[in-house]
Amino acid sequence: METNQILETIRMIEEEKLDIRTITMGISLLDCMDGDGEVARKKIYQKIVTKARNLVAVGEAIESEFGIPIINKRISVTPIAIIAGSSADTDYVEFAKTLDAAAKEVGVNFIGGYSALVQKGYTKGDEILIRSIPQALAQTERVCSSVNVGSTRTGINMDAVRQMGEVIKETADLTADTQGLGCAKLVVFANAVEDNPFMAGAFHGVGEADCVINVGVSGPGVVKRAIEKVKGEPFDIVAETVKQTAFKITRMGQLVGQVASEKLGVPFGIVDLSLAPTPAIGDSVAHILEEMGLEMVGTHGTTAALALLNDAVKKGGVMACGHVGGLSGAFIPVSEDAGMIEAVQQGALNLEKLEAMTAICSVGLDMIAVPGDTTAETLAAMIADEAAIGVINNKTTAVRVIPASGTKVGDMVEFGGLLGTAPVMPVNGKSSASFIARGGRIPAPIHSFKN
C-alpha cells in the first residue's frame, strides 16, 4: 500500500469523522419458543447473554487494533411477536424487559426486534405485541421496536397503519417526560429487510442464520470532502468521485465485519452501505447535497442530488464488499443531521420535500418532530403515504416521527447524543380521519406479480 493511501485513511478517520456506525449481532430466538412465557424469557435471556457476551469487548479490541472508531455495538433478535406468540401470555412487556436486561448485561447500546410483521394481517402474537409497544418502550431503556405494515407483494395493511398512528401517539404521551423519546425507538416500515444493522428498525429475520454479524458504515464527512475537490465539475465526475470514496469506506466496513466474525466465531452477514449522519459538524448528509451546488437542502434539485449520491454510494460499495444488504440508502434523519436541522429552521425543508426524498432513500420521514396535538389519524396518514412510496417503487421506506407532547411549531425537542435535536415541523392542518377510518388493505400493485 502506498504511503499517501495510508495518510488518506488516517485523515478520513481523524478529520472527516469516518467511523463504523455499528456492529450488530443478529441472534435467532426461534429455539427459545415455549408455551410458558416465563420459560421462554429465561431461554431468551440465556441465549442473548451467551452469544453476545464478548461483542462489546471484541468491538473495542478492533477499535484499538485498527484505530477505527466503532460507535455502537448492538443486537437484533427474531421478531418477538413470533417468539412470544407461542406462549399463553396476554401482554408482552415482560419480554421487552428481558431484552432490556440482556442488553444491559452484555453492554450493548440498543437491542432491536421488539417487532411484528403484519403486512398482510395479524396473528394473536402480533396483536398483543403491537398493543404493548407504548408500555414496552416506556418501561425499557435500550429496546427498539418496529412494525412492517406493507410490502410490494402484499400491499398495505391499513388496519395496522391506523393502529400504528395510535401507538405512536400513546408512546409519545407515556414518554412525555423525555419529550417523546420512546417514539425515537419505534419505526414503521414497508418492505422491511431482515438483515438491517441500524436502529431502531433492526430485527433478525426468520430466514437468517442462528447468529450473524452485520456492519453499518458511516462517512458523510469523507464524501463531502471528496466532492469539495471537484467543485464546478460535471455530474459524471461527481458521481465517479462519490463512487471511489464509497469503495474505500465500504472496504473498511468489510474488514471490520470479517475480523469481528473471526474473533466471535460467528458468520459474517452483510455491510449496510447507508451513509448515516450524526449531529456533529462535518458529519452531515445535507452538507454533501449542498456541496453539489444547492444553496440549502430542501430547495429544488435536492431530490436529484440525493439520487446521484445514493446511486454512486451503492455502486462503489457493491464493488468493495462481497455481501451488501440492510437498508443501503442515504439516511436523512432531521434531528441527527446539522444541515437538516438548519434547513428546517430556515424554512427551506418541509415534510412534503422529505416525503419526495423518500423515493430515493430508505427512511424518509426520520426523526421528525411534529406538534404535540397532531392527531393519531394524521400520523397514520403520514405512514400510509410513506408506505405507498415503498410499495409502489419496490423499496424499503419507513417513518420515525415524534409528536412530542406539549410542543408547537418552531419549538426544539432535545434528545441528546446521536439522536440530536429536532425542530418541531408543521403538518397539514386538513383532516385525513375519514380516509384512515376505512381500514382494510390497499391491494398489491400490478407489477408485484413477478412469478
UniProtKB/Swiss-Prot annotation:
InterPro entries: UPF0210. CDD domains: RNR_PFL_like_DUF711. It comes from the Bacteria. PANTHER family: UPF0210 PROTEIN MJ1665, UPF0210 PROTEIN SPR0218. Belongs to the UPF0210 family. HAMAP family: UPF0210 (MF_01221). Homodimer. This is UPF0210 protein lin0538.
